[in-house]
């Protein structure tokens, strides 16, 4: 018997209810259950911090163009996956129309999320795309000749580079 697909991300489930259901099932069948936790362990551990490069005004919504692209984080492009986007600096001003967060790659799938209401952003503001710990790095690529971004491990008040940002020479040599 396989449940398949792992447990999923923490933000989409109620673990206690799930555990009770599985325990009842296992007790009745007198079987051993083995879990492959999937992205439930690290899915919510990563953030992709991105800078607002430009705001393009549209008729029905504005486009917030970030410096991160689909090559840096592919899940929204591949699976239409939702990842909450939070501003690094909060303010009380609101955008006047809906917004869509997009990347700088000229592809229709280089987008991260649509919000009907969001705080006002300006160029050079920073936002964080949440829950990118699972598959964020492993799905990243040099698509469109874009260098791989830096990865930083933060533990309390200390940080360490896991991977430094790829420079152009390393990109060409690879």
Give residue ranges: language-model regions.
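Single conserved hydrophobic/aromatic residue that forms the stacking wall/gate
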Residues: 1-11
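Charged (often Lys/Glu-rich) extended helix/loop segments that serve as interaction or gating elements
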Residues: 21, 30-174
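Catalytic cores of soluble, metal-dependent hydrolases
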Residues: 8-9, 24, 28, 32
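Glycine-rich and small/hydrophobic secondary-structure elements
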Residues: 15-26
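C-terminal helical cap(s) of enzyme catalytic domains, especially alpha/beta-barrels
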Residues: 12-15, 146-147
């Amino acid at each position: 018997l396989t449940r398949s697909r792992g447990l999923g991300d923490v933000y989409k489930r109620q673990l206690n209810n799930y555990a009770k259901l599985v325990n009842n099932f296992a007790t009745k069948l007198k079987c051993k259950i083995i879990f492959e936790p999937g992205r439930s362990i690290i899915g919510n551990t990563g953030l992709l911090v991105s800078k607002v490069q430009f705001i393009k005004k549209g008729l029905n919504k504005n486009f917030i163009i970030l410096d991160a692209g689909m090559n840096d984080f592919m899940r929204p492009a591949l699976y239409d996956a939702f990842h909450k986007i939070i501003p690094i600096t909060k303010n009380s001003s609101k955008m006047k129309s809906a917004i869509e967060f997009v990347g700088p790659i000229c592809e229709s799938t280089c987008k991260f999320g649509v919000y009907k209401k969001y705080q006002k952003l300006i160029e050079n503001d920073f936002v964080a795309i949440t829950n990118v710990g699972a598959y964020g790095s492993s799905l990243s690529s040099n698509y469109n000749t874009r260098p791989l971004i830096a990865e930083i491990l933060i533990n309390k008040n200390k940080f360490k580079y896991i991977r430094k940002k790829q420079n152009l020479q390393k990109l060409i040599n690879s």
